[in-house]
Amino acid sequence: MTSAPLAARLRDVAGPLFFPVTAFGPDGAVDLAVFRAHVRAGIDAGAAAVFACCGTGEFHALTPEEFRLAVGAAVEESAGQVPVLAGAGYGTALAVQYARAAEEAGADGLLAMPPYLVVADQQGLLHHYAALAAATGLETIVYQRDNAVFTPETVVALARTPGVIGLKDGHGDLDLMQRIVSAVRTHRPGGDFLYFNGLPTAELTGPAYRGIGVTLYSSAVFAFAPDIALAFYRALDSGDDALVDGLLDHFYRPLVELRAQGRGYAVSLVKAGVRLQGLDVGEVRTPLTEPTAAHVKDLIEIIASGRALLAEHAAAGGGA
């Protein structure tokens, strides 16, 4: 656990937010040694924060004990260099148990995922996240997606909830996000509520989200191609439009189109990408399935295209 307040550390980040995959061995058990290597490699590559056991990390497929061990391993590998956040989800009672396990394991904060299966009204969602935030001393980011999509008024209430520091948007409705940002700015002036672009390949919509003031984003690509993810992050931050557009056109858009070819590819393609870089993190757990051989070949070509573009950009004097 780091000493500085989480919100302040995340507000001042200078790199992508890293969502590691959870490694499984040939027997299907969590491989903590490989997971540690994956987390350490990401931190060494320039991750600004680690979000362990979240969507990309197959939170849904982990037992409470596996979750506790993996979060603890991520905390140990971070050693205070960057904040570590952990996923927490399902119904309120179980989400609280995961949150307390994350706190005991030394995490700095929580990513609160949507409640399991149920479709609740806005008041019910607010009560759920307020109870989760009150259950520990960890600061909480609420994940908007699927069955947890909020009105601007609800987000204003969340922003006033002790312990809730931000909203990660995985819904992708820019009109709604603009109204949310405006409502919180109006009704909680001077506040420091954080917003994150949390779409599956957030870089594709990075320029659009920056237009409404959302500069923080999760990077699934960072898990398997940190060089490309960092180059894009720096180009977007510095206004290198040529590199941003090149990577969007020749890497990120093809990747998103490939991701759309199979259910669960937002996770299984990332895991395949990590394996392609030489770290055997195993396969995804059921009910997710592995990408087809043809799609893995496509992924190899997309990664090669992205790296070729970086090499051309560097050769032209643009840096990387």
From Swiss-Prot:
InterPro entries: Aldolase_TIM, DapA-like, Dehydro-deoxyglucarate_dehyd
Keywords: Lyase
An example Gene Ontology molecular-function term: 4-hydroxy-tetrahydrodipicolinate synthase activity
Catalytic activity: 5-dehydro-4-deoxy-D-glucarate + H(+) = 2,5-dioxopentanoate + CO2 + H2O
SMART domains named among the record's database cross-references: DHDPS
Keyword Repressor among record annotations: no
Pfam families on file: DHDPS
Name used for this protein in its record: Probable 5-dehydro-4-deoxyglucarate dehydratase
Upper lineage: Bacteria, Bacillati, Actinomycetota, Actinomycetes, Kitasatosporales
